């Protein structure tokens, strides 16, 4: 078992602080409008100190967007593994995505606005993970309704994401639980009515 040294923990903590600062600022202003010095100041370090942890501002964006795409895919795979029943699997996917959308509205904003600012290799990595995530939903929907066509299931999955990912635009910061109930009910209704 490997344990982090005190210095290793500090470095990991600083890296997390820099990512959190970058996430907040990029969500507020957009990637292009944020300077490396702004991120450093928000994290309590000088701009150049960031280079000890990341090669540049672009690397922060890569870590944010590739990171969330990878986490979403892994989470959905885990939901399926834990829920062999098709109905429970779909409910689990809805709850999992709701957890993400309510906890990470800044990442949704960044994804919507700044994906094009990623280097092409990172964009491909994000898109590949997103396609696999969509296919998990398509599979879950078709397992629940074997008569459902693949294209229709894909449209339904994307519609569900549109509803669930509306949180940065529709949710007041003080009402995540109210929003959860409404978004869950609307998503279930939308997926059930097709």
PLM features: residue spans?
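N-terminal intrinsically disordered/low-complexity leader segments
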Residues: 1-13, 20
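Generic hydrophobic, amphipathic alpha-helix propensity
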Residues: 14-22, 39, 64-68, 72, ...
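Helix-turn-helix
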Residues: 17, 21-59
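Amphipathic alpha-helical linker/stalk segments
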Residues: 66-91
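Amphipathic alpha-helical packing segments from all-alpha helical-bundle domains
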Residues: 70-73, 120-145, 154-158, 181
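Amphipathic C-terminal alpha-helical segment
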Residues: 100-103, 139, 150, 157-177, ...
